[in-house]
């Protein structure tokens, strides 16, 4: 997802730019990019399947979650580590790197079934069945 281009495909050409979805940018009569894109990003993702794997940041996934229906299966991947209290702590930079590596893993391995992403292991992150739910796949850093 891109605040500037919308939904991107793997080989789409893009010009380098710096624009965040949450930018307070008026476009036409819309007060921000969330309003500008409306449900069009969701509709584009939903064309092929009702299963949506969310590897986006909260900033970007917000523009999809708002439009989800009961028929949709929306699964978010969380990359973190357990702190002393047993709670999952997400380090933004590591999580961003892991999300990118997950995309590469899916493309390299031609992943078509959602459960196959559970086999992902990289940057010491490994799927945790104990902390995962049907809506959130948790990958914990192995220390």
Language model features with spans:
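Internal, well-folded beta-alpha domain core
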Residues: 2-133, 138-143
């Amino acid at each position: 997802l891109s605040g500037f281009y919308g939904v991107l495909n793997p080989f789409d050409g893009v010009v380098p730019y710096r624009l965040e979805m949450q930018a307070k940018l008026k476009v036409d009569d819309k007060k921000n990019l969330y309003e500008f894109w409306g449900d069009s990003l969701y509709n584009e993702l939903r064309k092929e399947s009702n299963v949506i794997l969310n590897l986006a940041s909260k900033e970007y996934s917000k523009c999809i979650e708002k439009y989800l229906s009961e028929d949709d299966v929306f699964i978010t991947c969380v990359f973190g580590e357990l702190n002393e209290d047993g709670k999952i702590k997400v380090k933004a930079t590591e999580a961003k790197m892991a999300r990118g590596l997950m995309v590469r893993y899916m493309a390299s391995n031609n992943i078509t079934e959602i459960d196959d992403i559970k086999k992902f292991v990289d940057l010491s992150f490994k799927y945790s069945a104990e902390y995962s739910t049907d809506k959130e796949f948790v990958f914990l850093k192995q220390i």
